[in-house]
Amino acid sequence: SAATYPVNPSPANPSMTHTLNYGLLNFAASASKKVSNDQINATLSKTVQNKSSSEVANQIATTLNQAVAIAKKYPQVQVSTGNQATYPQYDKNQKIIGWTGTASLNLKSTDTVAASKLIAELQSFMTLDGLDFSVSDAARKATEQELMIEASKNFQRQAQTLLPVWGAKGYQLVSLDFSQGGDYRAPRAYGSVMMLEAASAKVADQNFQAGDSTITVTANGTVQLVK
């Protein structure tokens, strides 16, 4: 993802209010930091089949209502409904012989223990489709704020380094913007790999390998050389 924060400072020297048409340098400087993944993300789903489309819809609704009711015991976990779909089943003569319905539930939390307990309960009637780890929004934003300062300092140092090469005694900042990037999410681990068994009491105590993500902020700007 990227965000732009334009910086258009007033000229430090009143005599430099002329048109910017020469002595311009455009370059970038970055700052990166490795951050621990502090958020667990999981997706569970339910698939039902029935000859009646209304019965399929009823079973899906019952499943989601049951899941949401259980999730209320874990306020530390944010729960949202995902994709839902109902589609017909056909025989060889293209005649509808039944219906299939699917629905998914998305979970995310910075409380790994609470999330794993909830996942264990939900797995008694839903399937764990996937689980991964990422940097939470709060941690990411805090880190990006730190890196904006560091990237700015790196930009200033780079500008100073370039002055002698161009025979300049100083520079004036013309514009500057920041972009954020990086690998925020650890590789996805699917249910068959994670093996979060619903009946196992060890689920809540499982030591997850959340891993790290690297966050990078780049300062890209233009300066005018002062001779």
What function would you assign to each model-found segment?
Residues 1-227:
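Short, charge-dense linear interaction motifs
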